[in-house]
Every structure is written in C-alpha cells, then in structure tokens.
Curated annotation (Swiss-Prot):
GO terms for biological process: protein ubiquitination; red or far-red light signaling pathway; red, far-red light phototransduction. Pathway: Protein modification; protein ubiquitination. SUPFAM superfamilies: F-box domain, Kelch motif. InterPro entries: F-box-like_dom_sf (IPR036047), F-box_dom (IPR001810), Kelch-typ_b-propeller (IPR015915), Kelch_1 (IPR006652). This is F-box protein AFR. Component of SCF (ASK-cullin-F-box) E3 ubiquitin ligase complexes, which may mediate the ubiquitination and subsequent proteasomal degradation of target proteins. Part of the phyA-mediated signaling transduction pathway leading to the regulation of gene expression and hypocotyls elongation in response to red and far-red light exposure. Pfam families: F-box, Kelch_1. Residues 29-74 form the F-box domain. Kelch repeats lie at residues 80-126, 135-178, 179-227, 229-276, 279-325. Keywords: Kelch repeat, Phytochrome signaling pathway, Repeat, Ubl conjugation pathway. The kelch repeats form a beta-propeller structure involved in protein-protein interaction. The F-box is required for the interaction with SKP1A. Residues 1-15 have a biased composition (Polar residues). The gene is AFR. Induction: Rhythmic expression with highest levels at the end of the dark phase, just before the transition to light. Induction by far-red light requires phyA.
Length: 372
C-alpha cells in the first residue's frame, strides 16, 4: 500500500514537472519572441482576462503573474475603471459593476460569495481598495468564517481572504499605507457597538489588532489623507450636539480628536483629491467644499453645480488624480474636473457619464477607481 502511494506521488510530481516544462517551452504567440508577445498581451482589454487565460497555460501563467500588472503600470498602459457597489431596495439584490471611463461601457462583475449576498443591508458591509494593485476588498456581514473577500481585476475573480478577528457590521474601512483598516461598527447578534480596530496586511494575509477608538462612533463617513485616517459620525437630528470625529496617525499608531472645524463642516460624502479633503454636501444644490487645514475651515468650490434632476441621493463618491466621480440613484454618474487657481481657490467642471439602463432601480453603496 505504501509502495503504491509512493509511486502515485512520484507520478504526480513528474506530471507537474512535465506541465511546467511544457508551459515554459510553449510560445505565448506562435512566431513571436516571448518578450514581444508579452507586450501584445499587456494591451488586452479588461474585463476579458478570464477568457484570455483559457487560451493556453502559458497565457494563464503570464496574465496571473503579479508582474503583469506592474508592467502595465510601468508602461502607462493601465487605465482607470470606476467600480460601483449597488443595491436594489425592492428586491434586496446587490451587485458590483464597472465602468470603462474611456469608452463609457459598463460591465457586471461576477457575484460575491454567497455569504455576502444574504446580508440585511449593503451598508452592513464596508469596502476598501488598492487602486494601483487593481484590488477591491469587501468586509463585514457578521459571518465568522467568511467576513472578508478580495476582487482581483486582472483575474476578474473574487476570493476569500483571512477572516477578520472581530466580524462586524456597519463600520468604516480604508487603505492606510497599503494595509486595510476596519474601524468600529457593531459586533454580535445584538448589534453591540464596538471601538475595536484591526488592520489587514495583504502581503501575508493576516489581521492584527490596532489601537482602539477612544469612543464609539456611529457610521457616517471616513477618508484617508496621506498616512492618516479620519473617521466622523456626522451630524444627527435634531442637531443639538456637534458631531464627534477621530483621526488615526499611522506613524504614531494613535488616535486624536478631530479638529472642531473639520468635523462640524463635514456635511456630506468625502473624496480625497491630491491629498486634499473635499465633500459633496447632501443638502440644497449639493455644493462641493474643500477643507483648509491651515485655518480649520471649509471653503466652497466654485464652478458648476451637480445636475439636480439627474443626481439624486444617495451618493457614493471617489476620485482619481484631479477627477471626482459622484454616483447617484439609478447609477447616474457625474465626473468632475477639479482645478486649483493661483490664489489657492478650487473650481470644478462637471459632465454626465452614461449610466446603464438596466440599473435604474439600483442605488450606490460604495464606489472606487481601480487601474487595470
């Protein structure tokens, strides 16, 4: 019996060795040197990489290699795509979809694992991203065993990562120095508020404990500015008390109270453009504001206003370079170009982006820009 198992293991090893040898010797594109063929593969458009990988084992190995995305970025071939996490209140359906910002075409992503499709509300989850690595992270939902998944754009696939140490719901998350932080929220079946914070390292697939929040904060909004993560609970009716907020310094590993001007003027969903904090206000004609740390004040951004007849709440906002993307009900998208004048004032110019007709009943819960 032992001899049969040994023989079987040897055969398996030999088969693997033969497959590796065949893959190495197999040209990527017949008649072309592999270095030239790789340049051709680098220009294959997203989201069809899953189909391209099925062409041959050599294509699959090349496209799934982390060096492939690095090469696209170093050659300035990677392009920004807008990813939207949307939900339908009537049917409780949730889905991710992506917009090619160059062509205006929309794609629906593969569904997330089942444990994430049975949640009570999309806001029970929290989403973060690593734009230049082309990865989306979806956390939470309360499932002890499957509380974290990652979407990799190059493979167009979801995969489970190590579960969070404290599975939670209704919390905020963000990418701080290449690590994904999960802050606060509710834990347990009774929804008990928590101040616990943890950080995920994608390099070794591990979670570690981070210094706790000094206080419980209701989920509203958060933003990562440089090496700091700002968390605010926002204003709450009847507006008798100013909102609370905390700022995490990743260099010091400590929390400090958010300045009064920052937390009191944070009256909308935020986006960080070139290390400056902006918000799209959720009242009136949805004016855009920018935070000025020098005097702890907010200033209105001049220029056009969002088209109120097309842009209806709820909003999800993200940014890339000097552009801001606002996703509204019906998955209507407005793209704003932000510019800074010589006097330090900011202005914005808006344009509407095509929205998928099939998503008219959907509303956004989160959005991110990835480079693919």
């Amino acid at each position: 019996m032992a001899e049969q198992e040994t023989t079987s293991n040897i055969n398996t090893i030999n088969d693997q060795a033969e497959e590796e040898t065949r893959t190495k010797s197999q040209p990527l594109i017949s008649g072309l040197p592999n270095d030239i063929a790789e340049l051709c593969l680098l220009r294959l458009p997203y989201p069809y990489h899953a189909l391209y990988r099925s062409v041959s084992s050599s294509w699959n190995k090349t496209i799934t290699n982390p060096r492939f995305l690095f090469s696209k970025q170093s050659l300035s071939i990677s392009s920004p795509y807008l990813f939207v996490f949307a939900f339908n209140k009537s049917t409780a359906r949730i889905q991710w979809q992506s917009l090619d910002l160059a062509s205006g075409r929309w794609f629906v992503l593969p569904p997330m694992p089942n444990s994430f499709t049975k949640i009570s509300s999309p806001h029970a989850l929290s989403c973060a991203s690593m734009p230049r690595q082309g990865k989306l992270f979806v956390l939470g939902g309360g499932d002890v065993n499957r509380s974290a998944v990652v979407y990799t754009a190059l493979t167009n696939r979801w995969s489970c990562i190590s579960p969070m140490m404290s599975p939670r719901t209704y919390f905020v998350s963000g990418n701080v120095n290449g690590k994904i932080m999960a802050v606060g929220g509710s834990v347990g079946g009774n929804g008990e508020a928590t101040t616990e914070v943890e950080s995920y390292d994608p390099d070794n697939d591990t979670w570690t404990v981070v210094k706790k929040l000094p206080m419980v904060l209701a989920k509203y909004d958060s933003a990562v500015i440089g090496k700091e993560m700002c968390v605010t609970e926002g204003w709450a009716w009847p507006f008798m008390f100013p909102p609370m907020g905390q700022v995490y310094d990743s260099d010091e590993g400590t929390w400090r109270e958010m300045s009064g001007g920052m937390k009191e003027g944070w009256t909308g969903v935020s986006v960080v453009i070139r290390d400056r904090l902006f918000v799209i206000s959720e009242h009136g004609d949805f004016p855009m504001k920018v935070y000025c740390s020098d005097d702890d004040t907010w200033r209105y951004v001049s220029g056009e206003k969002l088209q109120g007849e097309k842009m209806r709440r709820p909003f999800a906002v993200t940014g890339a370079d000097d552009r801001v993307f606002v996703v509204a009900s019906g998955i209507n998208v407005a793209e704003g170009r932000v510019s800074e004048g010589q006097n330090g004032d900011f202005s914005v110019e808006w344009r509407m982006v095509s929205s998928p007709k099939s998503s008219i009943q959907f509303s956004p819960a989160s959005c991110h820009v990835l480079y693919v």
